[in-house]
């Protein structure tokens, strides 16, 4: 009897610890960071602020020579509203392949099927509803092949 009670307590503790909510993040950076902390973290990762493309009161755009994408962070006061990664690649096929790979990787990571409101050859959208935010993978091969990954944190629930 004593062993059964200890086993049940251990299982309860294991379940409680494993269901701990992970913060919604962009490439390992929690979106609960303040705007200034996020900017500093991006700078330490080798990104520079593109002041010509940024709006000092609402958005900050980051660029780096080391990667083929730009990152836009939208904010209000010191709170991050969204982070968007935009890839510009040379061919439609490369963006299609990348869209499919990102979609498959997120499906495995989140253990969820995406909502796909648009699934055409050159325009695809996959929305993943994570517990603490929405991740959208968007393909737009119209004038220039463009792939966008958007992270939007959900508002905290009020008790």
What are these regions (language model features)?
Residues 1-4:
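Positively charged n-region of N-terminal signal peptides that target proteins for export
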Residues 6-9:
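Sec-dependent N-terminal signal peptides
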Residues 11, 71-72, 123-124:
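Intrinsically disordered, low-complexity boundary segments flanking structured domains
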Residues 13-16:
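C-terminal motif of bacterial Sec signal peptides marking the signal peptidase cleavage site
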Residues 21-55, 88-159:
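Non-cytosolic coordination micro-motifs
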Residues 59-63:
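Acidic-and-aromatic substrate-binding clefts and catalytic sites of carbohydrate-active enzymes
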Residues 64-100:
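Mid-chain, structured segments of secreted extracytoplasmic proteins
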């Amino acid at each position: 009897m004593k062993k059964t009670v200890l086993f049940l307590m251990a299982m309860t503790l294991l379940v409680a610890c494993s269901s701990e909510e992970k913060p919604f993040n962009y490439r390992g950076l929690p979106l609960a960071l303040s705007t200034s902390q996020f900017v500093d973290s991006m700078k330490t990762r080798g990104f520079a602020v593109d002041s010509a493309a940024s709006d000092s009161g609402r958005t900050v755009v980051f660029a780096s020579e080391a990667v083929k994408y730009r990152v836009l962070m939208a904010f209000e006061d010191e709170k991050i509203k969204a982070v968007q990664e935009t890839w510009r690649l040379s061919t439609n096929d490369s963006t299609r392949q990348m869209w499919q790979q990102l979609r498959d990787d997120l499906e495995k990571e989140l253990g969820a099927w995406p909502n796909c409101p648009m699934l055409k050859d050159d325009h695809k959208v996959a929305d993943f509803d994570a517990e603490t935010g929405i991740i959208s993978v968007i393909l737009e091969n119209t004038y220039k092949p463009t792939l966008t990954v958007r992270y939007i944190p959900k508002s905290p629930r009020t008790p």
